[in-house]
């Protein structure tokens, strides 16, 4: 079973990394989502979010960095949620 969990984490991490890269390829797709957290200079934040998601995704994909990546992902989600609440 742990091997299956590792495979799921690897695939999920790679999927997150691909989504992060998509922020650079088609940033307009993410502007609507990002605008609620960052209403000013939204495009810049789309790129920053893409970089963070790519890094966290790659971290999740590698077993050696998975624990750190989970902590980073939790911090990132709290940061985003805080910005959404603050900019309501």
Region locations from a protein language model:
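Short amphipathic, positively biased membrane-proximal segments
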Residues: 1-88
């Amino acid at each position: 079973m742990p091997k299956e969990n590792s495979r799921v984490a690897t695939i999920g991490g790679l999927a997150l990394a691909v989504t992060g890269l998509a922020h650079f390829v088609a940033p307009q797709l993410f502007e609507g989502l990002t605008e609620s957290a960052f209403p000013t200079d939204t495009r810049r934040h789309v790129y920053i979010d893409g970089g963070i998601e790519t890094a966290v995704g790659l971290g999740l994909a590698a077993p050696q960095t998975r624990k750190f990546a989970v902590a980073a992902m939790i911090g990132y989600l709290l940061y985003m949620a805080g910005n959404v609440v603050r900019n309501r």
